[in-house]
């Protein structure tokens, strides 16, 4: 497959997805970015996901595979900050942050997939607040704040 782009050959079930459309537009608008820049690696990551069929929540790519696949020269943390976070903010990709094989990066196909991601994020935040609440035993103001936030996040999660 050509490195110049993709017209969704490997993501046919998602052809009408606004995320796929944004991905293709992003590639088209950034064809002339300088090799080796963070923008270059953002484009290469989107191409990698499209070209390898990582569209839809059940077709997630491992971060390490993307890093290898696009020959990203820095570490995983830099990749997350320079490549993944901007692509999420542009509305092109989503990630599940489960540990191990259950996590991964993908281009969403529909709203239901985003709802699943949102629930997973809220569940993780709720869990971290519960941990903080326990750790803050003896520091009542932080314990109370963590409990209040945890309740709010729980209620938000249940509205999705």
From Swiss-Prot:
Top-level taxon of the source organism: Archaea
Function in brief: May be involved in control of expression of the type II restriction enzyme MjaV and/or its methyltransferase M.MjaV.
Organism: Methanocaldococcus jannaschii (strain ATCC 43067 / DSM 2661 / JAL-1 / JCM 10045 / NBRC 100440) (Methanococcus jannaschii)
Protein name, entry field: Putative control protein C.MjaVP
